[in-house]
Amino acid sequence: MSGDQYKIQDQNAYYFLTLTVVYWIDVFTRVDYRDVIVDSLNYCIDQKNLELNAWVVMSNHVHLVGRVDGGQGMSAFLRDFKKFTSRRIMELIDEIPESRKGWLKDKLSWEARRSRRAKN
């Protein structure tokens, strides 16, 4: 979901969402990083009223079909989900053996600094 062309109009409506990794980097080929996504989705289902009808984690993006029932709505879910998962994946890159550690951190960190939305 890049740019402002797609705005969440109804915070409690169903949406088909695609969340991509910058530069289409294949981060989710490693199970450890994929588990961050799955665990975060499960947490949001239990704690943030997320209702998922379908989801899939691909090598470099995630598709979700669902809604947030009440609470702060879809925008807040997306903000919190992306913030937590991106930080946790960056931590894991340092913690686990990663052959592309320097390259991954360089690409992902550079984009985070460049983004007008990221507040690090």
Labelled PLM ranges:
Residues 1-120:
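Short catalytic/metal-binding and nucleic-acid-binding patches
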